[in-house]
Amino acid sequence: MGHKIYTQLMNGVSHMLPFVVGGGILIAIAFLIDGLMVDMNALDVAERANFGTITPAAAMFKQIGDVAFGFMLPVLAGFIAMAIGDRPALALGFVGGMMAHSGTSGFLGALVAGFAAGYIILGLRKVCEKLPEALEKIAPVLIYPVVGILIMGLLMLFVVEPIIGGINTALNNGLTSMGSSSKIILGLILGGMMAIDMGGPFNKAAYVFGTAAIAAGNYDIMAAVMVGGMVPPCAIALATLLFKDRFTKEERESGPTNFIMGLAFITEGAI
């Protein structure tokens, strides 16, 4: 059972990674361009909030990268769902993933949506088996998408978003209340949150808090966030070089890619 869930999860992750890598590196280039071209000390608080889109070249890279990143959660949820319920589940997963992306449940919400979408289709199949043959034939093109997307949407709106979104909001509020406390303790917590779930709710909460600190002119908090986010992919890449016998040939070949992703601050590369 555990291996089956892992296989379904990795089907989503493997399809998601190209969007993460492409979008993440383009966004990193946008920040690099602004970092080289703009004097941060000359900007006011409102202008600092736009860091990464200040110069036209940076804004272009950021726009393209953001679009690619926007597909991350729908693709993750869609292909997890497809691994469970085959092609009819893909649409449900995409809808659930997009609702997680546009809402507050984020990465964890997309994971729940992917698995839920797959099992919704399995349930609908059992129900449709009892229908007259004429109705059963139109189920894949009519009943599965209409009823399935409706159930998926209601589940996201009334269960996943309130619960998981509430957890994410509580995390952000907790970090905000620590803003005036010891910066060393705050840095340790944020760095650990960035590294612990590699793109999940803890990671995203820490990143949002770090970007908010930049907008307020506090750069040292984001430094801790970035170091924590770079550790997992860089550590895995280093491990593939130092302990080659512990990894498969395919994993060893992906090691250098993880170095690049780590230096580009793409924590999800460790997945």
PLM region descriptions:
Residues 1-133, 137-271:
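Pore-lining transmembrane helices
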